[in-house]
Structures are given as C-alpha cells and as structure tokens.
Amino acid sequence: MSTKEKLISHVMKEEPVGSRNKVTVVGVGMVGMASAVSILLKDLCDELAMVDVMEDKLKGEVMDLQHGSLFLKTKIVGDKDYSVTANSKVVVVTAGARQQEGESRLNLVQRNVNIFKFIIPNIVKYSPNCILMVVSNPVDILTYVAWKLSGFPRHRVIGSGTNLDSARFRHLIGEKLHLHPSSCHAWIVGEHGDSSVPVWSGVNVAGVSLQGLNPQMGTEGDGENWKAIHKEVVDGAYEVIKLKGYTSWAIGMSVADLVESIIKNMHKVHPVSTLVQGMHGVKDEVFLSVPCVLGNSGLTDVIHMTLKAEEEKQVQKSAETLWGVQKELIL
C-alpha cells in the first residue's frame, strides 16, 4: 500500500464537474498577467486557464502562480494548446503585438488582425458559448475583428473599451476635488484612445452636475481648465509607457472589474466597446464604447446617453476614422 492509500480511503469515483465560471486569459504579457492576478485576487472563478504561443514564458508564469495556490481558491492551468481553455465562461484576449513608445494604437492593426486569425477560431472551437472580451489594442477595431471571426452574436463580444479611460478620468477628477473616484461620476465614451469623448454634461458628484456649477466646464473658455483632465487621460497611457515601458496594473484591474460584472451577473453599467451602428448617428459597422449593462449573458442592454451635438459629432468622427481603417483590413 502506498502512503496515499494508507492515508485516504476512496469512497466513490468522482464525476467530472465542469466549472460554471471558468475564465481564460489569452496572452501572458504584462496586461495578461496583471489581468490574471487581478481576477485571482478577486476570487472570481474556480478555474483560470492561460494560453500563449511563448511556451517557456507561459510555463514559468503558470508555475509561479501555482506556487501561490495555498493562498488562492482558484485552480490554475496553462498550455499552448487551446484544449486547456475548454468550456470557459469568459475568455479575455490580451495577446497581440505591443504598442511601442510613440506608436498610435491604430498603427498596430494589421499586425494584430493576423494574430487574431489564429486565436479566435481556437477559442470558438473549445468554448462556443463563451463571452469574448477583447483587450488588445486598438481595442475597438479588434473587437470588430473578433466579432467577425467568431461568428458570435454581438452581445457575446465585448471590448474593454473606455472602462479604463473612464476610471482614469474619475481618478483625476477625484484628485482635483479631493474625493474618492467612486463619488465622482463621469463617463468617457467613443474610441479607446486619442479621440475618446469626455461627457462633461454628465459629470456629477452626489447628483450635482458640475457643468451646472461651471457652464464653461470642458470648453476652451473655462478658467479652471478642466479640459486638461481629459488630455491627461489620453496622455496617461503614453506617459506610463514612457516611464516604465508598458501599462499593466490599471488595465488588469479594469478587466477584472468587467469579468466580475459578467460572472456575478451584476447588471452593472460599464463603458465598453460594442456595435454602435444606428446609435448616435453612426452608420457603419463599428464598435465604440457606450454605457452597457453587463451580466451573465454578456452585454444585455445599452444605455441611451444624452450627448450634446458637439459630443455626438466627435463620436461620429471616431466612427468614421475606425471605419476608414476597418474597410482596408484583410479578414
């Protein structure tokens, strides 16, 4: 008799029970790992699967996380073969070429489309009912690409979009007012990145509209220069990349925030990238961020935001820019 047999007496053969809240992270770069750790520390899933083409890096990261199993409640698995991802509830795609210092998010496009042509069919093969969350940049275009390549209905393909931009925005407003970001309600919509749209008309604290107190807020004529806050949001990522070489922690936490709303069926409203054709005067098949309700089925509803004419025009301009790029893509 082995030590194990002397220690444990077997009662029954265990039936395999599938995890109802398995999460997969594709890509073990800086963003993938920050997302994985954030998901683990929030205790969101029973099983976390990780995939990447870089076999040694993947193996090392998985092993490193597994060494912390005692401190976690999640089973961690990893392999370059996508069978390890089978039956995931949410699949987070962070893989792709990384943005270089000074490189625009749009410049990354075709490089990442080619990577997606391999990744997406593999995800669909093993988790045909999952919710796909795209994080790789340029996120709005790649969410469209993932939607096209997956054949999934639109409510199951979500881009992380401006969830992080809005968090940065709320943080900076909070800094200016000496308040916690959760008490500063503010939304950034449209494209994730350089042409994102701050909805100044909706900025409020405890239901008090800041534009009601300062009608010039967000415009050139504003003596308090609130507009600079949005510029800081846009420049924020570039600044972090310049200083430490990449961004990771905040986007990782932002991803975990979205995954939580889905897995726990919270019906929370998040600014995420979805098909906006027919909204805010957008005519083309583009994905942009608008406030959306997230739950167990994915993206169930969209909130009708009251945008000013100028804001609406910016959203349409973003849509045109994105469509200009999308129609050139070889899918």
Swiss-Prot record:
This is L-lactate dehydrogenase A chain. Its main location: cytoplasm. SUPFAM superfamilies: LDH C-terminal domain-like, NAD(P)-binding Rossmann-fold domains. It is found in: Cytoplasm. The gene is ldha. It comes from Notothenia neglecta (Yellowbelly rockcod). PANTHER family: L-2-HYDROXYCARBOXYLATE DEHYDROGENASE (NAD(P)(+)) (PTHR43128), L-LACTATE DEHYDROGENASE A CHAIN (PTHR43128:SF10). Pathway: Fermentation; pyruvate fermentation to lactate; (S)-lactate from pyruvate: step 1/1. Belongs to the LDH/MDH superfamily. LDH family. Homotetramer.
